[in-house]
Amino acid sequence: MAPNVALADSMHNYQPKPGKRNQEASELRKTLKPLMEKRRRARINESLNQLKTLILPLIGKDNSRYSKLEKADILEMTVRFLRDIPPVQAQNQADRYKEGYRACVERLSAILGKSHVLTGEASNRLLEYLQRSPELCSSDCNHPPKPQRPRIVLQVSPRTSQFGSPLQNQPSSHRPAPCPPQLNSSIWRPW
């Protein structure tokens, strides 16, 4: 075992003469180039085979009848299939905003149901307010409000805070906030 360790150490410390270094590097590239090319071709062929197995069922062709296809045929079939896909109707900005808003309200209702931060009545009033807010806003303006934290003051049950002092009851707001002007076209998502 000792001779192998010595041989490994000597190979690790081996430094060819400056003229030989370039020659050895060139020879190494020449020997590695066919291996790299072989690997590259294997990757291309594997990807084309996967593409063929994916695309044939989608265009209604039988894999067994098309076992031998040229690479160009596979690529052409794929391009035709992708061109024939009908374009997806993009939701407009307001619909995406409303969808995100609804998801947020649903998540909040699940959290409020489990927590005991608000009384049942206050929790219900908050959820009713949040469910009404986008409808009231959509009648006033045609765009979603800019991102901001809502200023909703709710009546909290007379419990004590973490520090032992009673929590103060504050009147709740029944009007939705007016829709602010739209500053940019990006959509704010609460998550």
UniProtKB/Swiss-Prot annotation:
User: Could you identify this protein by its name?
Assistant: Transcription factor HES-2
Name the cystine pairs. none
Q: What does this protein do?
A: Transcriptional repressor. Essential in the retina to govern glial versus neuronal differentiation. Promotes gliogenesis through the inhibition of neuronal differentiation by at least two distinct mechanisms; represses proneural gene transcription, and also physically interacts with proneural proteins, including neurod1.
Quaternary structure and partners: Transcription repression requires formation of a complex with a corepressor protein of the Groucho/TLE family. Homodimer, and heterodimer with the other bHLH proteins neurod1, neurod4/ath3, hes1/hairy1 and hes6r. Weakly interacts with the bHLH protein hey1/hrt1.
Q: Which CDD domains match?
A: bHLH-O_HES2 (cd11463)
Q: Name one GO biological process term.
A: cell differentiation
Q: Which segments carry the region annotation Disordered?
A: 1-26, 159-191
Record domain Orange: where: 97-130
Q: What lineage is this protein's organism placed in?
A: Eukaryota, Metazoa, Chordata, Craniata, Vertebrata
